[in-house]
Amino acid sequence: MEKQIVNEPKEIDGYRVVQDGKEIYEALSKGETVMHWESGDSMYPILMHMEYCKIHPAKKQEINKGDAVFCKFLYRNEERKISDFYMVHRCTDIVVRGDEYYFKIECTDNTLFGWTKDVYGVAESTNIFQDEEALWK
C-alpha cells in the first residue's frame, strides 16, 4: 500500500478524524471508530510519526499484548490538580485479578509509562499521514 499524505481532513475512509483525547474517549464509549494521528517516534514501527491510526472500541478481554491501545492515565497538572491524560501506546503486559484488568503501557523502546485499568480501544496503522508542513503554514 502506497503512503498517502493528507491535510487535516474531517473524515478518512468514512471515519471521523478526532484529535482531542476526551473526544476520542467519548466516541469510543458510544461505539464509534475514529481516526487520529500521533506525532513522535515512540510507537515506531507500529505507528509512524504523523500517521493516522484507526481506533476502534475494544472490550478489555479483547486487548492483547503488543496491541497499540487508546488509554487513560491520571497525572498532576501545573495547578497540582489530578487530570486525565489520554494516549495511544503499546500494551506490553496484562494482569487479570478477578474482574479487573490491568494493562502495562510502554513505548516501543520499552520506556514504561505505567499500569492502567483504563483502556478503551485498539489502534491500527493506516499508512495515511498528516502533512506536517501544512500544519505550520
What annotation goes with each model-predicted range?
Residues 1-137:
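Extended hydrophobic leader/signal-anchor segments used for secretion and membrane insertion
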